[in-house]
Amino acid sequence: MNRRRRLLAAMLGGLLASPRAEAQATMPLETTGSTLCEVRGFATDRDPRGSNLRAAPRADAPIIGHVPPRSNIGQNTWTGAEFEIVGSKDGWLLVHNGDQDGDLKFDAAHAEDGRGWLSARLVGTTLRVAALRSAPRRDAPLVARLAGDNWGPDSVAVSAVHSCQGNYIEVTTTPIGGKPVRGWSFKPCSSQLTTCDGGITE
């Protein structure tokens, strides 16, 4: 008798939970108050299960998609999914596939839009220009110049991505032989094994 009651309770619980799950799955993407940007990045999450994409820039927002785990391409070299970064808010980045063959996967309600929120802690980028500025504009004061006799900006490790605005991304990075600095970099790329394409100047 107890077994039958438990079975009925489980079935009823599933039925009651279904409308809520469906409502979460169809929750519209929240973009109010976010910045707009046009930069690129890649996934850095070490979790073998990958990362969740959410409907809003907060950890308790409904999950609407998934970023696949990083791939080991040999000799302890890992690469993550690449994507466009089109917005930011409160330490979260709004990421976008860019094309139908992109690595990001979405539920049916959000697949056509192809955007979702990913924690900035799980995102990396490759810097393209030497100037690191105090604000996301060309005339802002320099924080650091990421270049030396034998190295350039794409040789610098980005330890954290914070936000983005326009064609700029805000990062913490460490110049070779220097201390960590935080600032804004112009037009980063998502290359992980090679340098960024040339021809871009701030």
Could you say what each language-model-derived stretch is?
Residues 25-39, 45-89, 125-164:
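Beta-loop motif signature
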Residues 18-20:
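N-terminal signal peptide c-region/cleavage motif recognized by signal peptidases
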Residues 7-8, 74, 88, 113, ...:
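Acidic, low-complexity intrinsically disordered regions
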Residues 1-15:
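N-terminal secretory signal peptides and thylakoid transit peptides that target proteins
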Residues 24-40, 87-139, 163-202:
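Boundary regions of SH3-family modules and the immediately adjacent low-complexity/disordered segments
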Residues 3, 46-48, 73, 77, ...:
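Short linear motifs in intrinsically disordered/low-complexity regions
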